[in-house]
């Protein structure tokens, strides 16, 4: 199985670390270099063409079936985009979180001591929703080990009890099918599976969900008519764009290149590719005597093997130590040779311990 875009990537290592950081495609690198050169020469400013923000907003909306650009706000990180959701909850409201949830999802709620935060195993999340639950916040795909949340089942549970659902799709967007009606609020960083930029993230909400929260400290970029309101703020837009923060335009150019490439290839094709590589790797690990987490995911985790990450890096295999385990992640630029190299390195690691 070959890379889905060999002309866009030329890593010098076996990069199996997309769950930490995606590799930028050549088109993104070229766009950023060109923008920097023009800026340094005084021919333009990074924000001279605001339509690039419209394009990236449209592109992200197309990743979620049923979403439109009016449902999308641009920001810089998951936690800050979740802050309005957390702040809108009344004192004593119950928030349900999964055990070992990534901290950018949990911290906006955990650090509001007036909320009643309850943490349960991921597999019991839907069963634990109850009438007093105000909100469930969860990642569609878990950062630590790649376990996949049953969003349809969880959505049914939240609807049955009148709870809201916030979903982080940072580890899912690009390879995992997403349906807008499966959550009230969506957040996503672009620098991992969207092969974008560290400084660009998205928030999505339908009007009825967005109307339950309000922007915290809106800036000039969130104005209904931003250039007309620079010195006399009048109104925020009726769309989810009112949650915009001023974007890093250089990051937007980088993220746009990644989104364009993902759309050209297609989520379905990327998902099939990633899952096939991950499944082959998972099967190989079992044959070597390891016990990886069994999940149909592009992330493969080996519990208790986190100490091997540094040894693998010395062999040019880039993975991550997370929550005591060793985490590998397979994306569109990986191929079967990467799987073979990683299995060889894991075999050598097995023999050395």
Which residues make up each language-model segment?
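Pyridoxal 5′-phosphate
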Residues: 1-353
């Amino acid at each position: 199985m070959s890379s889905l875009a060999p002309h866009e990537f030329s890593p010098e290592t076996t990069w199996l670390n997309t769950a930490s950081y995606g590799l930028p495609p050549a088109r993104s690198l070229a766009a950023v270099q060109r923008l920097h050169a023009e800026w340094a020469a005084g021919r333009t400013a990074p924000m001279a063409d605001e339509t690039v923000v419209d394009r990236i907003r449209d592109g992200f909306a197309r990743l979620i079936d049923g979403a439109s650009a009016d449902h999308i706000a641009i920001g810089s990180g998951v936690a800050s985009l979740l802050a309005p959701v957390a702040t809108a909850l009344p004192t004593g409201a119950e928030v349900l979180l999964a055990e070992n949830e990534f901290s950018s999802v949990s911290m906006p709620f955990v650090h509001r001591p007036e909320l009643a935060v309850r943490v349960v195993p991921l597999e019991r999340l839907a069963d634990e929703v109850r009438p007093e639950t105000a909100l469930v916040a969860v990642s569609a795909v878990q950062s630590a080990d790649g376990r996949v949340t049953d969003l349809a089942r969880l959505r049914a549970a939240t609807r049955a009890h009148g709870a809201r659902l916030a979903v982080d799709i940072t580890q899912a967007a690009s390879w995992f099918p997403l349906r807008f009606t499966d959550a009230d609020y969506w957040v996503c960083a672009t620098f991992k599976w969207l092969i974008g930029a560290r400084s660009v993230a998205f928030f999505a909400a339908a009007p009825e969900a967005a109307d339950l929260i309000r922007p915290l400290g809106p800036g000039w970029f969130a104005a209904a008519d931003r250039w007309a309101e620079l010195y006399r703020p009048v109104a925020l837009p009726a769309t989810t764009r009112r949650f915009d923060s001023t974007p890093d335009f250089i990051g937007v150019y980088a993220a746009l290149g990644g989104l364009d490439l993902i759309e050209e290839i297609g989520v379905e094709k990327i998902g099939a590719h990633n899952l096939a590589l991950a499944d082959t790797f998972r099967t190989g690990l079992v044959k070597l005597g390891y016990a990886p987490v069994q999940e149909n995911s592009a992330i493969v985790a080996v519990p208790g093997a986190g100490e091997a990450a540094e040894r693998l890096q010395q062999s040019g295999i880039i993975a991550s130590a997370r929550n005591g385990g060793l985490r590998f992640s397979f994306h569109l630029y990986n191929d079967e040779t990467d799987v073979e190299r990683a299995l060889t390195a894991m075999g050598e690691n097995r023999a050395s311990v």
